[in-house]
Amino acid sequence: MADGVDHIDIYADVGEEFNQEAEYGAHDQIELYEDVLSPSANNGDAPEDRDYMDNLAASVGDDVVKGSVPNIVYTYTGKRIALYIGNLTWWTTDEDLTDAVHSLGVNDILEIKFFENRANGQSKGFALICVSSESSSKKLMDLLPKREMHGQKPIVTPCNKQFLSQFEMQSRKTATQAGQMSGEGKAGPPGINARLPFPPGGRGRGRFPTSGPGGDRFPGPAGPGGPPPPFSAGMTPPRPPMCPPGPPGPPGPPPPGQPLPPPLPGPPNRGERPPPPVMFPGQPYGQPSIVTLPPGPPPPGYGPPPGPPPPQQGPPPPPGAFPPRPPGPPMALGPPPHLPGPPPGGPPPAPHVNPNFFPPPGNAGMTSSDSRGPPPSDPYGRPPPYERGDYGPPGRDMDVVRTPLSEAEFEEIMNRNRAISSSAISRAVSDASAGDYGSAIETLVTAISLIKQSKVSADDRCKVLISSLQDCLHGIESKSYGSGSRRRERSRERDHSRSREKSRRHKSRSRDRHDDYYRERSRERERHRDRERDRDRERDREREYRHR
């Protein structure tokens, strides 16, 4: 019976499956290779989209061997060529990049992705652009590096792991240098704070999706124009001069490997103003400042960033032109102590300087003991504590400083005080006779305070008026207290009667409870005694029974 059944050969298709694995094994290995290398090249970021990475070998043509058949099965029919565009400022938007590409005659943009920092969404300074034709990619490679975008010339490279890692390393180096420069007090990125909001229409809000791997930010130029100069591992950023600078000299050549900076624009128009220089305490007014803030990205609605600040207006004044001013709190970038201070009537510091740490130059009337700076032993430059005696409320000593009054003014104020006193006394007496003691007392207190606040309160005649008002006040208060005591006595009598009634009720209740309690106790005792008697009788019976 078993011989008649057709046996199913479960090993019949093993050979085909092994052949299929051999056929598609290379594809699986390529995908695994891409997955392994993506985190190391992107510094832990998400891997790139594989739809253009798979077409990389066919589009670039640098790793393709002629005559070899690719093992990858392509599902995307259209052509897609990806390029990296780097050396961009962090405030460059996708619209800026799109306009620059369209100006070259390239209109087949498929996608633009900016590489952003996942922590704060700030651009790293390079982006990925996808076009659909080989001619467009060649135009971008040849013509786009010649165009300037926000004062910098972009760099266009093929889309592969090598250039991606180079751009990532460059963004990390620039971020580290910017952190060192900001830690030393020098503003590297365009603006004091690197966490400024993006201008409207920026990345992520344009016409293209902007999701991309994160990383460190790519700050913009350190000056009015060109890119920040790179520093080697053993070098530190240049320190500013610690003396008043002279007229600006011609700019030096750019460092190797960087494009030429753009020509500096002319002075600003009538509607524009350059950023104000930072004012430090102890710096002469009108003297060129040591550190001038570079222009940052354009604020919303103000167009491109303005030009550089104009050259300084003339040489610095001689040291004896202004009276000396005590030095303020020491800073990392403060001026040398031999510089004279601003004049006493000069303007306060610039609005972006905290006035709590940089006092305005209007304190020339202070004594020499109070106007000294902080002691040199204080490493943080904290100012000495203020003496509260100068800021306390005015006391009796202020009466001496008051200007003397003329006879007419004195008589006018005295007549006014007399009228206030007489009207207050008459009104208080009428209110007290009507039984409204509160209104009478309030009227007299108000009149006394008004006369005490007048300019002639120290005169003897004013003191007589005040004493008469106070006597009237004491009399009305005694009457109000007497009537109140009578009322209180009556209320006390009522309260005593009520409390007596309550106490009687309570005592009667407590007595009843006490009697009930004792009755219950006596009953319990009687029951207990009865039980004891019964037990004794039982014991006696048992003894009698045993003796028999």
UniProtKB/Swiss-Prot annotation:
PROSITE patterns for this protein: RRM (PS50102)
UniProt feature, compositional bias: Polar residues: 169-180
Cellular localisation: Nucleus; Nucleus, Nucleoplasm; Nucleus speckle; Cytoplasm
Keywords: Cytoplasm, mRNA processing, Nucleus
Any one GO cellular component localisation term in the record: nuclear speck
InterPro entries attached to this UniProt entry: CPSF6/7 (IPR034772), CPSF6_RRM (IPR034769), Nucleotide-bd_a/b_plait_sf (IPR012677), RBD_domain_sf (IPR035979), RRM_dom (IPR000504)
Region (Disordered): 169-401, 473-548
Domain of life: Eukaryota
Keyword Cytoplasm: yes
Residue spans of biased composition, Basic and acidic residues class: 385-400, 490-500, 512-548
Residue spans of biased composition, Basic residues class: 501-511
GO biological process, one term: mRNA alternative polyadenylation
Domain RRM per the UniProt entry, residue ranges: 81-161
Physiological role: Component of the cleavage factor Im (CFIm) complex that functions as an activator of the pre-mRNA 3'-end cleavage and polyadenylation processing required for the maturation of pre-mRNA into functional mRNAs. CFIm contributes to the recruitment of multiprotein complexes on specific sequences on the pre-mRNA 3'-end, so called cleavage and polyadenylation signals (pA signals). Most pre-mRNAs contain multiple pA signals, resulting in alternative cleavage and polyadenylation (APA) producing mRNAs with variable 3'-end formation.
Self-association and partners: Component of the cleavage factor Im (CFIm) complex.
UniProt family annotation: Belongs to the RRM CPSF6/7 family.
Protein name: Cleavage and polyadenylation specificity factor subunit 6
